[in-house]
Amino acid sequence: EKLLVSGGPYEFMQRCPTFGCMAWVIDRQGNVLHSWEVDTDKLFAQIPNLAGKTKPENFYPSGIALTPDGGLVMAIQGRNTYPFQIGLVRIDRNGNVVWKHWNNSHHWIAVAADGTVYAPYREAIDGKTHFGGTAVETRCKANLGAEGIGVYAPDGKLLRRISLLDAVDKSDFSGLLYGLRTGCDP
């Protein structure tokens, strides 16, 4: 059995001495079978719409998944940044960036056998006063934070976005939105 271990910038420097290992695969005896080192200075340069401490060491993979060809897809989070959910990065087996989307994707992702990537995302919705066709007010003075699932082709092309808020709105369970503690974060 093999285990996929997440790392980050400057982690496991014995194995990845320049930038650290973003992830590595080990067997049950602890032998490292493969690792991914990425030039984090290049990877994390010019992330748009991000405030806070944007040094590479403040970014880390919060979700990782292997691709069918031995590459890796990572959901990147930020410490001391706003927003904290940064986006998705696909790297090849050698640690080269294949594609990246700084689109507020976050946490646990999944890669299907055909290479399709499924990743949760967060988006800010401005001007929404009610949830769907209900009488439930959002009570937001600022943007509403909504979640969804992004579906990506193996080449990184966005195929579809599935809004979880819209799915609940259109279901027979839209009344669940009435019990929200804060109307800005369903």
Tell where the protein language model's regions lie, with residue ranges.
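Histidine-/acidic-rich catalytic cores in large beta-rich domains
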Residues: 1-186
